[in-house]
Amino acid sequence: MANKLLALSLFLLFSGCFASTFRQQPQQNECQFQRLNALEPDNSVKSEAGTIETWNPNNDQLRCAGVALSRCTIQRNGLRRPFYTNAPQEIYIQQGRGIFGLIFPGCRETYEEPQEQEQGQGPRPQDRHQKVEHFREGDIIAVPTGVPFWMYNNEQTPVIAITLIDTTNLDNQLDQIPRRFYLSGNQEQEFLQYQQKEGGQGQQQEGGNEGGNVLSGFNDEFLEEAFSVDREIVRNIKGKNDDREGSIVEVKEGLKVISPPTLRPRQGREEEEEEEEEEEERRGDRRRHRPHHHEEEEEEEEWSHQVRRVRRPHHHREDRNGLEETLCTLKLRHNIGQSTSPDAYNPQAGRLKTLTSLDFPILRWLGLAAEHGSIYKNAMFVPYYNVNANSILYVLNGSAWFQVVDCSGNAVFNGELNEGQVLTIPQNYAVAIKSLDDNFSYVAFKTNDIPQIAALAGLTSSIRALPLDVVAHAFNLDRDQARQLKNNNPYKFLVPPPQSQLRAVA
């Protein structure tokens, strides 16, 4: 019987994994643009210790890409209350440091405080919880659908986090309006106004319970029995005694949780080695903290881990590194900021770093990836296109001139993109970027866990790969001109400024 149950569970799990490898397709003509626009947040919800800004998910560009965006600012000692969403999230830390946690149902609480004696009362109950991790500027944090997430700023610098929600991922069985299900508090839903505009009165009723969190609508008696607590605690659970504003609250005396040592600033390969050491330490923590009694529970835990293996064959391939990770031991963050080793680097033009599921396996489950780029003033990212993904680009610093061209050869965007603005670059649309500032940088969220780009100019371009005669006849050039077109640009992706504009080199 147990074997049959395990087989059925694995079948259901892998069926779900295969299903989530595909994204819902946009409706007909939803991705046909005569013009793209630089987008800015159009709604802001203030909290006691921060602010959450949102972009309208009903905007045509975001609907085409099937995503929603928000920007969260958390002040010193600010705690973002635990919540989960109806779609996977990819979070980029633009600024600041702190700690965060994800709560995976069924995983053990492997972090526990030392047992203490209370005077005259014997041992005090230990606090145990699931793992807590540090984050820093440049980190990508992956949050699967329906997994509760919280974060806390324990530094002086405000934390700024950019979140992409993949609303067309098939893990989302609702509509394309993102929903944040808070576990506590009494706060406004950040995307509620878009639900009301899109869905009318029916949607207003959906968000209209009096407490504002997922427990608020239950009867007091239900919660008393479920948690085995008194009526006063139930009132707090439902948010009735909580007059703190919003979903980010101030922890005046600082948050006391069991967490690993604070990350030390590192550079380049040292930082990557530190992350590898942290990953091994996380695995060791799980082994050390696993109870050695109750054999039946231990077997049940191991069975649970086996059932929850993450094998998302997004591209119908064998596991790429021969390893399988369980939900309970997954690596949840990966740094792609300035301090990491770039994938492409030109000392006079800039650097690029791409994060895919090959580096960060949980992205296979989410079906997402990310790219960080910094381009020096007057340097160019050659014309290219995203082969198999939409790209949602957010400007972190500075400004740059963007040109985006559709399949008919029309420039659907030709203008400046500034700090804090977003541009959606649809799949296969050609794009070129020229930096207007020395500190221009961006993060781009990609809707494929192994995104590919194809250059249209330069050393690795499609045109360079064509036979000379094909280039000559396709572009109506003589052979010498065709040879120049193929070979004159010796750079792969990032082209330095013209010689007259190059920065002086000591």
From Swiss-Prot:
Molecular-function GO terms, alphabetical: nutrient reservoir activity
Skewed-composition ranges (Low complexity): 195-207
Record-annotated disulphide pairs: 31-64, 107-328
The keyword Acetylation belongs to this UniProt entry's keyword annotation: no
Disordered as annotated region, ranges: 111-131, 195-216, 251-322
Residue span, Cupin type-1 domain: 36-235, 334-483
Top-rank taxon: Eukaryota
Residues making up the signal peptide according to the UniProt record: 1-19
Biased composition (Basic residues): 306-315
Key words, A-Z: Allergen, Disulfide bond, Glycoprotein, Seed storage protein, Signal, Storage protein
Pfam families listed in its UniProt record: Cupin_1
Biased amino acid composition, Acidic residues: 270-280
Tissues in which the protein is found: Expressed in developing cotyledons and in the embryonic axis of germinating seeds.
Glycosylation sites: 397, 439
Role noted for this protein: Sulfur-rich seed storage protein. This protein found in the seeds of many leguminous and non-leguminous plants is the source of sulfur-containing amino acids in seed meals.
Oligomeric form and interacting partners: Hexamer; each subunit is composed of an acidic and a basic chain derived from a single precursor and linked by a disulfide bond. Component of globulins complexes which accumulate in seeds.
Family: Belongs to the 11S seed storage protein (globulins) family.
PANTHER family: GLYCININ G3 (PTHR31189:SF77), OS03G0336100 PROTEIN-RELATED (PTHR31189)
Name of the protein described by the UniProt record: Conglutin alpha 1
Organism: Lupinus angustifolius
Gene name linked to the record: CONALPHA
